[in-house]
Amino acid sequence: MQTSKNQDELVKTFKSILKEERFGSQSEIVVALQGEGFSNINQSKVSRMLSKFGAVRTRNAKQQMVYCLPAELGVPTAGSPLKNLVLDVDHNQSMIVVRTSPGAAQLIARLLDSIGKPEGILGTIAGDDTIFISPSNIQQIEDTLETVKSLFNYTD
């Protein structure tokens, strides 16, 4: 008879598999945890863990509904792990668009607003995972784009 791994290992593995953003149902999470050696796991335990850690269902990059954990974020600074939340930076002739991990856009927009006009950012509008940046001067949008990319160490 296989013994169940301890609670700390379960929590660590649970968080790790949710970061993969590929599990759309609680039963898929149960199967994944059982595959990792947690033989005593069941749907009700998974449900309680999802609730305890504040997991939500959201769309992943493939537009599939999946469970994920909210980002554990502190005060925003350019040197903090916020750079890991920026997934894409693009622009057209009048606007820069930043795509982030789900739930991170408003926090990153707050950081961008705080650096403001001196760095070429007139203002931002943020949703859940997308930020629209209006540059101070459209003729210098390339400079503003490079500033945003360098803030988050983003490379194409």
UniProtKB/Swiss-Prot annotation:
Pathway: Amino-acid biosynthesis; L-arginine biosynthesis [regulation]. GO terms for biological process: L-arginine biosynthetic process; protein complex oligomerization; regulation of arginine biosynthetic process. It is found in: Cytoplasm. Pfam families: Arg_repressor, Arg_repressor_C. InterPro entries: Arg_repress, Arg_repress_C, Arg_repress_C_sf, Arg_repress_DNA-bd, WH-like_DNA-bd_sf, WH_DNA-bd_sf. GO terms for molecular function: arginine binding; DNA binding; DNA-binding transcription factor activity. The keyword Repressor applies. Gene3D superfamilies: 3.30.1360.40, Winged helix-like DNA-binding domain superfamily/Winged helix DNA-binding domain (1.10.10.10). Its main location: cytoplasm. It comes from the Bacteria. Keywords: Amino-acid biosynthesis, Arginine biosynthesis, Cytoplasm, DNA-binding, Repressor, Transcription, Transcription regulation. GO terms for cellular component: cytoplasm. Belongs to the ArgR family. Regulates arginine biosynthesis genes. HAMAP family: Arg_repressor (MF_00173). This is Arginine repressor. The lineage of its organism: Bacteria, Pseudomonadati, Pseudomonadota, Gammaproteobacteria, Alteromonadales.
